[in-house]
């Protein structure tokens, strides 16, 4: 179970899976059916792309980042959101502990928008 804090209220969700290290899908238990399944995008960090990997090393890093993110959410799963949505309509969430762990393991980089650097040498 994942807990998501929005406007001081904690909501419960089930992790359906992660596409890569910074994009996952959650099923909110208390939401109306049209809001129940939400893709979420973690803010403040960027991880390697899994589907659009430009080299083998990026794909390997992306798999590690995805696995770490999934494990984090399955064990600790505390996220925060202000309800805003990103460029592709995903709910923007933050997870400071996850961010720090991914960055310390070199599976993510700090990110605040704009052009991103590549992951291939």
Language model: regions and residue ranges:
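Small beta-barrel nucleic-acid-binding modules, primarily SNase/OB-fold domains
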Residues: 1-121
């Amino acid at each position: 179970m994942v807990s998501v804090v929005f406007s001081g209220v904690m909501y419960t969700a089930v992790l359906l899976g992660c596409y890569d290290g910074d994009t996952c899908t959650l099923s909110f238990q208390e939401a109306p059916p049209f809001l129940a399944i939400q893709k979420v995008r973690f803010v403040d960090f960027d991880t390697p792309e899994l589907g659009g990997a430009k080299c083998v090393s990026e794909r390997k890093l992306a798999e590690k980042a995805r696995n770490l993110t999934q494990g984090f959410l399955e064990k600790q799963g505390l996220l925060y959101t202000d309800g805003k949505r990103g460029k592709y309509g995903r709910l923007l969430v933050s997870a400071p502990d996850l961010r720090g762990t991914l960055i310390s393991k070199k599976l993510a980089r700090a990110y605040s928008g704009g052009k991103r650097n590549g992951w291939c040498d």
